[in-house]
């Protein structure tokens, strides 16, 4: 089990790399995260929902993602509440106190999934959540040491040296653990190191002498990895890219409950695109394309967007010939009305959308979860689309008669998705990952005004990044010592 001294210490990345290292060695390996809290999720082949990181780790392990790899997924809908997804299906909505009381039930799901994986695979590489040293969360813990103790799992502790204080993080974390938990930690990985390793060696020697535990290795800071980010849009992603040769400027407003921002990974990596995320209080700069992202709380995020003064800026953007795309929750914002009569995403009621597309959306009790494939409806050449749907909204109206995509269902029938405005400036779709296929990316960029647009093969970039990550772990970690417990 890989645990971290902090959030974003590199647990997900290390687990992905270890999965590929073990898969290369011919092992049947599966990733596992008992409990994940994230708004970035993926859809499994059987129509379940898991954390995006576990889907990436499954790819690294060269296996199909399965709901057992992330049995408990928490999708925050407010600062104090979340949708609880068990074995891939939304079960209930709870506030923090109610979920704490529910944890014994959640642990049953965790243990059942873990048992199935251990029966099916040679090795299960487990990822913790946040830090095991959160004293207030120790009671009924199912994500870190509470799980490790229950299944008798050895733990490797990862710390991020790039943020500073790495030795305090490691020693302090150990000090907060119980004796049995401390004994369970077999050693350390120091992540994201830049500089001369010889200057770090005295600190490593001190750490090993102080704790009696080995440092399995120091991983360098790896620039340019094209791997799915799990949670918040990190600073490097939010900042101006400053691509000198970029020909198309794309803006994405960052909403409080933005979901599946991995939709923009292909644009982030595209050499012809200058992708920028704008946060609260920032003006909408001149752009060719504005994309309204997915949201876990669409009406609340629509209120936030308006409170920031972005609606007049978007109307001005369209008036001067700019293009707008809405994805999932963003699609719902582009219609006339959003209705939530049962209060699935907050207080019951209705909100006026922007009205740029003629349809209304009603939030239903059952979530649509499916992988999809098809093509762009209005492209000058065949443009294949591949992605997934995760939404509770059902949209109806005449605007949907001019679809954005044609999707091929499993039964062989073709169905319409999304909408496109009569003037061709506004496009909406429920499909996440709409930019991921090279021909779809090329077609959408051409529609947005980029003449000579080229597609980008995000899948190939992701696979190359996994290989590079595995090479780095193999060359910088003492894998023999770290995997010793597996041979017992």
UniProtKB/Swiss-Prot annotation:
Give the residues annotated as active site.
Answer: 328 (nucleophile), 432
What Pfam families does this protein's entry cite?
CbiA (PF01656), GATase_3 (PF07685)
- Pathway where this protein functions: Cofactor biosynthesis; adenosylcobalamin biosynthesis
The chain positions of domain GATase cobBQ-type read 247-440
Q: Which SUPFAM superfamilies match?
A: Class I glutamine amidotransferase-like, P-loop containing nucleoside triphosphate hydrolases
GO MF terms listed in the record are: ABC-type vitamin B12 transporter activity; catalytic activity
Q: Which PROSITE patterns match?
A: GATASE_COBBQ
Q: Which UniProt keywords apply?
A: Cobalamin biosynthesis, Glutamine amidotransferase
List the InterPro entries: Class_I_gatase-like, CobQ/CobB/MinD/ParA_Nub-bd_dom, CobQ_GATase1, CobQ_N, CobQ_synth, GATase_3, P-loop_NTPase
Q: Name one GO biological process term.
A: cobalamin biosynthetic process
Protein function: Catalyzes amidations at positions B, D, E, and G on adenosylcobyrinic A,C-diamide. NH(2) groups are provided by glutamine, and one molecule of ATP is hydrogenolyzed for each amidation.
Q: Name the family the entry cites.
A: Belongs to the CobB/CobQ family. CobQ subfamily.
Name the PANTHER family on file. COBYRIC ACID SYNTHASE, DETHIOBIOTIN SYNTHETASE
- What protein name applies here? Cobyric acid synthase
Q: What lineage does UniProt assign to this protein's organism?
A: Bacteria, Pseudomonadati, Pseudomonadota, Betaproteobacteria, Burkholderiales
């Amino acid at each position: 089990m890989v645990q971290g001294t902090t959030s974003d210490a590199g647990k997900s990345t290390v687990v992905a790399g270890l999965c590929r290292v073990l898969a290369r060695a011919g092992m049947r390996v599966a990733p596992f995260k008992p409990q994940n809290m994230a708004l970035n999720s993926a859809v499994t082949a059987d129509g379940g929902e898991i954390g995006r990181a576990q889907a990436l780790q499954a790819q690294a392990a060269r296996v199909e993602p399965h709901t057992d790899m992330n049995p408990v997924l928490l999708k925050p809908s407010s600062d104090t509440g979340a949708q609880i997804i068990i074995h891939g299906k939304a079960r209930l909505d709870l506030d923090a106190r109610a979920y704490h009381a529910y944890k014994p039930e959640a642990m049953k799901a965790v243990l059942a999934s873990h048992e199935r994986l251990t029966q099916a695979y040679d090795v299960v590489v487990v990822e913790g959540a946040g830090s095991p040293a959160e004293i207030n969360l120790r009671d009924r813990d199912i994500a870190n040491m509470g799980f490790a103790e229950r299944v008798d799992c050895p733990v490797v502790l990862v710390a991020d040296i790039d943020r500073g204080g790495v030795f305090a993080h490691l020693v302090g974390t150990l000090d907060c653990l119980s004796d049995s938990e401390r004994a369970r930690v077999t050693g350390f990985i120091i992540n994201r190191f830049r500089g001369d390793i010889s200057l770090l060696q005295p600190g490593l020697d001190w750490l090993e002498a102080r704790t009696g535990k080995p440092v399995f290795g120091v991983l360098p800071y790896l620039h340019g990895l094209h791997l799915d980010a799990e949670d918040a849009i990190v600073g490097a992603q939010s900042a101006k890219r400053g691509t000198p040769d970029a020909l198309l400027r794309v803006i994405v407003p960052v909403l409080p409950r933005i979901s599946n921002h991995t939709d923009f990974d292909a644009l982030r990596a595209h050499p012809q695109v200058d992708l920028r995320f704008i946060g609260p209080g920032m003006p909408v700069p001149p752009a060719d394309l504005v994309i309204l992202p997915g949201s876990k709380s669409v009406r609340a995020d629509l209120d936030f967007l308006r409170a920031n003064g972005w609606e007049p800026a978007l109307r001005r953007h369209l008036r001067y010939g700019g293009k707008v795309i809405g994805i999932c929750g963003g699609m719902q914002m582009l219609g006339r009305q959003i209705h939530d009569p049962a209060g699935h995403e907050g207080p019951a009621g209705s909100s006026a959308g922007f009205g740029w597309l003629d349809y209304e959306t009603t939030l239903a009790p059952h979530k649509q979860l499916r992988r999809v494939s098809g093509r762009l409806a209005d492209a000058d050449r065949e443009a294949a689309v591949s992605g997934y749907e995760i939404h509770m909204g059902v949209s109806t109206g005449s605007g949907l008669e001019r679809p954005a995509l044609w999707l091929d269902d499993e039964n062989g029938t073709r169905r319409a998705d999304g909408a496109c405005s009569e003037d061709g400036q506004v496009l909406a779709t429920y499909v996440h990952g709409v930019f991921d296929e090279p021909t779809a990316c090329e077609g959408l960029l051409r529609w947005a005004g980029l003449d000579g647009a080229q597609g980008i093969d995000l899948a190939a970039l992701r696979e190359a990044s996994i290989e590079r990550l595995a090479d780095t772990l193999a060359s910088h970690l003492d894998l023999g010592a770290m995997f010793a417990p597996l041979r017992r």
